């Protein structure tokens, strides 16, 4: 619970624990604001942003201290404003979001271009809570522009693929995909490993068995071809979906059996 990393196959579930705490904190904080008659989205946003920035600054100033319970704490602090961004958009900004697409994309690209020009490296890693090389404000600005970009892209795609069964299948199983994506990748690696052993190396003879057994981050690409990464994407999507479908059926059967007895 503290690390959020559990078994290596479930490394993708690291976000569950801080998000769980964020939900609890959010409910309690909003109840407190109602008691003092200050239940306002702007206040919540400002407070959560301040908390998130303190969390990032803690990681910047004390990188060696980010482990154990401290890691869970700063992850939770970082998530608070991210969680509020969604609520704030829904409650305040969505009805005012009427800017035409040209102006919308122009602003996003202008902000991103400015960040890319004047900042060292925009990449940061919230799972390990590292690589905050541009202070405690830039990570949130870059995140907001990225979210705004994909929000606009999704609006373009909805008329074309909004009712697609495949898209809905993926959209309805995003939690399972996030949690079990590494299981999907490992399944594909097991296929490569199995074929290599069965054919005595005639197929995928350069598969590194030692790396496969020792590191979950070993990804075998036949002949080093990056195009094989697409197959990892397929396994990373549909193996978790299959797991989710099976688990849902088991839960449904168990739930029905229990209530029949009652």
Predicted regions and their residues:
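Alpha-helical transmembrane segments and their immediate juxtamembrane cytosolic regions
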Residues: 1-262
């Amino acid at each position: 619970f503290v690390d959020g990393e559990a078994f290596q196959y479930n490394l993708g579930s690291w976000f569950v624990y801080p998000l769980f705490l964020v939900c609890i904190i959010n409910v309690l904080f909003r109840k407190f604001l109602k008691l003092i008659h200050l239940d306002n989205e702007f206040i919540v946003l400002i407070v959560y942003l301040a908390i998130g920035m303190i969390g990032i600054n803690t990681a910047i100033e004390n990188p060696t201290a980010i482990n154990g319970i401290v890691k869970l704490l700063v992850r939770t602090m970082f998530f608070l404003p991210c969680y509020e961004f969604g609520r704030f958009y829904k409650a305040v900004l969505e009805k005012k979001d009427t800017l035409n697409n040209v102006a919308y994309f122009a602003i996003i690209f202008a902000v991103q271009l400015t960040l890319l020009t004047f900042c060292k490296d925009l990449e940061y890693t919230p799972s390990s809570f590292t690589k905050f090389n541009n202070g405690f404000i830039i990570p949130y600005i870059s995140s907001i522009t990225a979210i705004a970009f994909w929000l606009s892209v999704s609006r373009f795609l909805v008329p074309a693929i909004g009712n697609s069964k495949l898209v809905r299948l993926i959209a309805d199983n995003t939690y399972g995909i996030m949690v079990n994506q590494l299981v999907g990748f490992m399944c594909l690696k097991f296929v490569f490993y199995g074929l290599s052993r069965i054919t005595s190396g005639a197929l995928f003879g350069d598969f590194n068995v030692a790396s496969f057994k020792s590191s979950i981050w070993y990804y075998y690409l036949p002949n080093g071809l990056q195009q094989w990464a697409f197959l990892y994407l397929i396994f990373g999507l549909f193996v978790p979906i299959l797991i989710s479908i099976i688990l849902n059926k088991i839960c449904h059967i168990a739930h029905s059996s229990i209530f029949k007895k009652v």
